[in-house]
Amino acid sequence: MDNYLGKDCIFYSMLAVPVPVYARQKMTREDIVRDALTGWLTVEFVFRPLKNDLISGMIYQGKIMYLLQQILPEEKGYRLLGFTAEQEEWCRNNEEQIWRFLIENDYLFSTQQRIMTKYLNDAPFTSGMPVESPGRAVVWTGYRIVGKYMQKKKNVSLERLMAEQDYHKILREAGYRP
């Protein structure tokens, strides 16, 4: 519970290793349910991709966010991602640029652990993008891909979605084009 004392809690800055400001934004009591459910879902639906690359990690995390949205339909999408409304708006306004950035830098199908860590883990902003971008902006893209996939595949149940480990198949069948 000490992770949810509020973003302005003075104790976070007094620790031997202070909690960065960007991380404190997600340390409110409103984040408890999201974090608890995310933890539970990642244990229930383990990441076992056919190919361990960035796009697979993006879509896996997008699937977790999509399922969270189904469980908590009243919660704003940006809150489920740990973003502010402004950060989600930035992603919406720059969706095509995010996608182009991943393709032009050959990151989308990268299997390099440092690339996956850099883009899938929490950060003050997404490396290589403006400081206005949220950390993990590519996870928002994964969430959008899953949304497009489920929109096209109306017969796919949540159970089937979560069981699918061929993330390249989800990408292909989503027909995602920002």
Residue ranges and their predicted role:
Residues 1-88:
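Acidic/His-rich structured neighborhood in mature extracellular/periplasmic domains
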Residues 55, 59-178:
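A cross-kingdom marker for long, charged
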